[in-house]
């Protein structure tokens, strides 16, 4: 039947000589309609399309050997599937268990039954569903509805099937095909300008785009526009829309494309959201325990120490004790606040601080000028210094402060060790900020303690203080008795 119109061997020879394009698929002039057999009459308007389909089938054979993902044809070429070369290629595929005579593609090796293959990309496996595509019925040809594509059991990997298209394709009525078959000129068919061909190309391109996005194992020939024209003839899943005229078929193809585009985008956004969610959660878990190590809260660092130093001594309260008392409470940040973690603080509202100091000392005429003169008295005693370049900014010298309060303490070694290290901090960040040399040790942590001579037999305070705590992450038993209330070390 096909030898009367065009030679299949001639088309294959042309394909071997040069890559086929839409302008090269025409191999022979159309023979007279009287030379055509009666069965060929209903297909006569598909002459150049058939030649393209033949070349596409050959192309699909080569793609199948390259582990391509799209393969199929129309029922009119069912005899091609019985060829020795294709049968051997199909036999090399893994056989599906419990399928009888089928393979992983679900293709029965029965040359007498004409079936179409609807291949859908499922990662590296090709799941397919066989259904009748074209049938000859009296006066015209009617395209039947493709069943919902489902992957055969046992072939697809145990992963999310991104490429399976579950929506059923619409039905193209016979009126659409009859309108296309009324075109008498062969060049118009060769240039694929008919609405039927355009509709197939548009529908198949959306299918190819959807599957190509879902996996990196798509056929290389499906990435260009020309190969879309070739691959579009053999893809079994089509997003066709019903239309009564030939021109309407081309216009209605966009609906199917939009359907599959939205399907594709929903999968893409879902997968990207999932991956971003996992990565952000992992980063959050990784960075959470260390977020406070980078930016420790000075109120939690200096709070217990400030309160204890402010209440130390006997007799009337001194100005530096009063300032430490205000700094120990973060609610007083409107008038005085810590600046960083090196002992620096700033009088945000110096008049309010002076007023509160006057209330404490029963001096209602107290102002900032008198208070600042009193602060200068502490410069010589190394209790605090003025921060140059900043207004209303001062800095406590904890070493001089400890030396000033040492005579009032009965056992300074035990006092400072227990007060500064054994206080129940709520997080390890507050503890490590006093011990780790990476958190301003030269300005605040080291200056909290008096000189090495005043510690008696503590020959090397840095070695004795920092070594067990720096090893606490490796051997927690060194500090476990003292850190039972710390959730970080639990």
UniProtKB/Swiss-Prot annotation:
<dbReference type="GO" id="GO:0000981">
    <property type="term" value="F:DNA-binding transcription factor activity, RNA polymerase II-specific"/>
</dbReference>
<feature type="compositionally biased region" description="Gly residues">
    <location>
        <begin position="244"/>
        <end position="255"/>
    </location>
</feature>
<dbReference type="InterPro" id="IPR036388">
    <property type="entry name" value="WH-like_DNA-bd_sf"/>
</dbReference>
<feature type="compositionally biased region" description="Basic and acidic residues">
    <location>
        <begin position="196"/>
        <end position="207"/>
    </location>
</feature>
<feature type="region of interest" description="Disordered">
    <location>
        <begin position="271"/>
        <end position="294"/>
    </location>
</feature>
<keyword id="KW-0238">DNA-binding</keyword>
<feature type="compositionally biased region" description="Low complexity">
    <location>
        <begin position="271"/>
        <end position="280"/>
    </location>
</feature>
<feature type="DNA-binding region" description="ETS">
    <location>
        <begin position="317"/>
        <end position="397"/>
    </location>
</feature>
<dbReference type="GO" id="GO:0005634">
    <property type="term" value="C:nucleus"/>
</dbReference>
<dbReference type="InterPro" id="IPR036390">
    <property type="entry name" value="WH_DNA-bd_sf"/>
</dbReference>
<comment type="similarity">
    <text>Belongs to the ETS family.</text>
</comment>
<dbReference type="InterPro" id="IPR046328">
    <property type="entry name" value="ETS_fam"/>
</dbReference>
<dbReference type="InterPro" id="IPR000418">
    <property type="entry name" value="Ets_dom"/>
</dbReference>
<dbReference type="GO" id="GO:0043565">
    <property type="term" value="F:sequence-specific DNA binding"/>
</dbReference>
<dbReference type="GO" id="GO:0006357">
    <property type="term" value="P:regulation of transcription by RNA polymerase II"/>
</dbReference>
<dbReference type="GO" id="GO:0030154">
    <property type="term" value="P:cell differentiation"/>
</dbReference>
<keyword id="KW-0539">Nucleus</keyword>
<feature type="compositionally biased region" description="Low complexity">
    <location>
        <begin position="211"/>
        <end position="227"/>
    </location>
</feature>
<dbReference type="Pfam" id="PF00178">
    <property type="entry name" value="Ets"/>
</dbReference>
<dbReference type="GO" id="GO:0006355">
    <property type="term" value="P:regulation of DNA-templated transcription"/>
</dbReference>
<protein>
    <recommendedName>
        <fullName>DNA-binding protein D-ETS-3</fullName>
    </recommendedName>
</protein>
<feature type="region of interest" description="Disordered">
    <location>
        <begin position="190"/>
        <end position="255"/>
    </location>
</feature>
